[in-house]
């Protein structure tokens, strides 16, 4: 397994840095660090405390069954507890999106970063956003490693689920680009308090507007004649 470059320690709290494109090239995500998704998955599981505890319990119970196989009561009770622990372990392993990562402060942090950077569909900005979110989860104790999102695609899919069903007010690309953003990424935790629910909804609507415009730009680049095709179907 490779080690992340020292440049990943660069602070990316603002977008005022003139060399943002250079920072993006040096940001290392888990998919760049690990040889495969399997090695990444094993690394994450091995550092997840509930998994380690349950694995240790199962191991001890199996040893009890082996060494005390002539004691029916011990074997029976150990087998019951081992089976229960195994079920719990499988439930934890199958939980790919823990509740910790659905906390309002994290979602607000993600929305503010999207609003600030205005990423394109499949844009390089998503690498920086993903790196920031991984660092945020780790630094705030919401995840046990700084590698929650394996790739920028994973973070982007999470964002799409977040804004799914949100109907933004239709704006032009110019109006979106010129709209003032009064919130800063470091203010996201405060904005996520229960008394600031309206701010969160505003962030959600704004991020949905940016994503809608990014989708329009993406499909227009891929199909320059899309407007003519749409007129024919009317």
Swiss-Prot record:
InterPro entries: DUP/COS
Chain positions with Phosphothreonine modification: 3
Domain of life of the organism encoding this protein: Eukaryota
Membrane-spanning parts: 48-68, 73-93
Membrane topology: Multi-pass membrane protein
Localisation: Endoplasmic reticulum; Golgi apparatus; Cytoplasmic vesicle, COPI-coated vesicle membrane; Cytoplasmic vesicle, COPII-coated vesicle membrane
Ranges where the record places region COPI binding: 231-234
Family matches, as Pfam families: DUP
The UniProt record lists the keyword Transport: yes
Keyword Zinc: no
A Gene Ontology term for the protein's cellular component: plasma membrane
Extracellular side stretches: 69-72
Keywords: Cytoplasmic vesicle, Endoplasmic reticulum, ER-Golgi transport, Golgi apparatus, Membrane, Phosphoprotein, Protein transport, Transmembrane, Transmembrane helix, Transport
Cystine crosslinks: none
Cytoplasmic side: 1-47, 94-234
BP-aspect Gene Ontology terms: protein transport; vesicle organization; vesicle-mediated transport
Record's subunit section: Interacts with MST27. Binds to coatomer proteins of COPI and SEC23/SEC24 of COPII coated vesicles.
Miscellaneous section: Members of the DUP240 multigene family are specific to S.cerevisiae sensu strictu. Cells lacking all 10 DUP240 proteins show no obvious alterations in mating, sporulation and cell growth.
Biological role stated in the UniProt entry: Involved in protein trafficking vesicle formation, probably by stabilizing of coatomer at the Golgi membrane and thus allowing the efficient formation of COPI coated vesicles.
Assigned protein family: Belongs to the DUP/COS family.
Protein name (database record): Multicopy suppressor of SEC21 protein 28
Species: Saccharomyces cerevisiae (strain ATCC 204508 / S288c)
Lineage of the species this protein comes from: Eukaryota, Fungi, Dikarya, Ascomycota, Saccharomycotina
Encoding gene per record: MST28
């Amino acid at each position: 397994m490779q080690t992340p470059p020292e440049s990943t320690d660069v602070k990316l709290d603002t977008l005022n840095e003139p060399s943002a494109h250079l920072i993006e090239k040096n940001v290392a995500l888990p998919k760049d660090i690990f040889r495969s998704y399997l090695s990444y998955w094993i690394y994450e599981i091995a550092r997840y405390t509930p998994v380690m505890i349950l694995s240790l319990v199962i191991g001890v119970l199996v040893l009890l069954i082996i060494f005390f196989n002539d004691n029916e009561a011990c074997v029976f009770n150990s087998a019951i507890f081992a089976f229960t622990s195994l079920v719990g372990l499988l439930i934890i392993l199958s939980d790919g999106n823990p509740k910790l990562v659905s906390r309002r402060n994290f979602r607000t942090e993600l929305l503010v970063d999207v609003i600030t950077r205005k990423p394109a569909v499949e844009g390089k900005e998503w690498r920086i956003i993903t790196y920031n979110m991984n660092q945020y989860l780790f630094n705030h104790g919401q995840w046990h490693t700084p590698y929650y999102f394996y790739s920028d695609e994973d973070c982007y899919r999470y964002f799409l689920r977040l804004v799914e069903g949100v109907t933004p007010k239709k704006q032009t690309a110019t109006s979106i680009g010129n709209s003032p953003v009064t919130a800063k990424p470091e203010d996201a935790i405060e904005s996520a308090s229960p008394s600031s629910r309206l701010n969160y909804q505003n962030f959600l609507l704004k991020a949905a507007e940016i994503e809608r415009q990014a989708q329009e730009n993406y499909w227009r680049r891929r199909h320059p004649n899309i407007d003519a095709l749409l007129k024919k179907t009317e």
